[in-house]
Design a protein with these regions (language model features):
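Conserved functional loop/turn residues at catalytic and ligand-binding sites
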Residues: 94, 226, 274
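A short, acidic, amphipathic alpha-helical segment used as a generic capping/interface helix at domain edges
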Residues: 258-275
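FabD-like malonyl-/acyl-CoA
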Residues: 1-146, 200, 277-311
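Short, solvent-exposed amphipathic alpha-helical segments in soluble enzyme
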Residues: 23, 151-153, 190-192, 288, ...
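Non-catalytic positions within long, well-ordered alpha-helices that form the structural scaffold/packing
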Residues: 77, 190, 271-274
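NAD(P)-dependent dehydrogenase/reductase Rossmann-like domain
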Residues: 181-183, 221, 274, 306-307, ...
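Alpha/beta catalytic cores of group-transfer enzymes, especially the acyltransferase/condensing modules
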Residues: 10-13, 39, 84, 104-259
Length: 317
């Protein structure tokens, strides 16, 4: 009866997240202090006080979400919980993979925060504002969504990029690329029978080929930090397999910038490898909700508040 810990991605941020963890657990507060020191600014003040529009900027949201996830984990550990002894696998959605890797000892908390700040800035700068877009497609088979993307790319100027960026499961796919191509693909998906095709309010076309400049920046950034083999298997977004090779993990993180987040397959992999319980560690309950739709046999829980820390400790022993 294995347990998996998962770490949320962008979109789960909210002003005030993690504050009660920091108030209840000195070890959790220390995580926020470590990240403030690493970034040379009071990110914790922004997390707890806002404004929301500044917190939502990708260069802030990415390290902020990791801070809350690692604070929740440190709170568990402060009460005697052992990640290595109690958890079989970890994974994270997009930026959450960095949280999972920091939790597993692949990189230090400080380096992970700096990597995510670099990643957020690089992804934001890769495409001029207004030229990229993303859309959520609900209730359409993946093959039909991919066909719509291919048709839209061919029908747009200069063979514009359009691709599936996130396979979230539960009938939800996210497409990403050039604005004109994504808008056309969303229209085509509706014509093919999608229940909804919703343009997303995002600042850049994440997880698309247009992020190639950001991928190169991350290749250099990852080469410049100390890396260790994780103490617990981390299931990769890009390959849906764990590896203990630090260089291979770094390669997969570079590929992740332009590649698909294969979250549905990740949850399916958990089920196939004996996971009976999945916890979402950090802000929100997006991943636990997705997991319930993907595999109803996996029980879910969340660890993002002081009360949830206590509940998880009682359940996990």
């Amino acid at each position: 009866m294995a347990v998996a810990f998962t770490f949320p991605g962008q979109g789960s941020q909210a002003v005030g997240m993690g504050k009660d963890l920091a108030d209840a657990f000195p070890e959790a507060r220390r995580v926020f202090e470590e990240i403030d020191e690493a970034l040379g600014e009071k990110l914790s003040k922004l997390i707890w006080e806002g404004p929301e529009e500044t917190l939502t900027l990708t260069a802030n949201a990415q390290p902020a979400l990791m801070a809350v996830s690692l604070a929740a984990l440190r709170a568990l550990e402060a009460r005697g919980f052992s990640l290595r002894d109690k958890v079989s696998y970890v994974a994270g959605h997009s930026l959450g993979e960095y949280s999972a890797l920091a939790a597993s000892g692949f990189v230090s908390v400080a380096d992970a925060a700096r990597l995510l700040r670099t990643r957020g800035n690089a992804m934001q700068a890769a495409v001029p504002p207004g030229e990229g877009a993303m859309a959520a497609i609900i209730g359409l088979e993946q093959a039909d969504v991919e066909a719509a993307c291919a048709e839209a790319a061919q029908g747009s100027a200069n063979g514009a990029v359009c691709q599936v960026a996130n396979d979230n499961g539960g009938g939800q796919l996210v497409i990403s690329g050039a604005k004109s191509a994504v808008e056309l693909a969303a229209k085509l998906c509706t014509e093919k029978g999608a229940k909804r095709a919703l343009m997303l309010q995002v600042s850049a076309p994440f997880h698309s080929a247009l992020m190639a400049p950001a991928a190169e920046i991350m290749r250099e950034a990852l080469a410049g930090v100390a890396k260790k083999a994780p103490v617990i298997p981390v299931v990769s977004n890009i390959s849906v397999t764990p590896t203990s090779d630090p260089d291979e993990i770094a390669r997969r993180l570079v590929q992740q910038v332009t590649g698909r987040v294969r979250w549905r397959e990740t949850v399916e992999w958990f089920g196939q490898n004996g996971v009976s319980t999945l916890y979402e560690v950090g802000a929100g309950k997006v991943l636990s909700g997705l997991a319930r739709r993907i595999n109803r046999d996996i029980a879910t829980g969340a660890v993002g508040t002081a009360a949830e820390v206590e509940a998880a400790l009682a359940a996990l022993g």
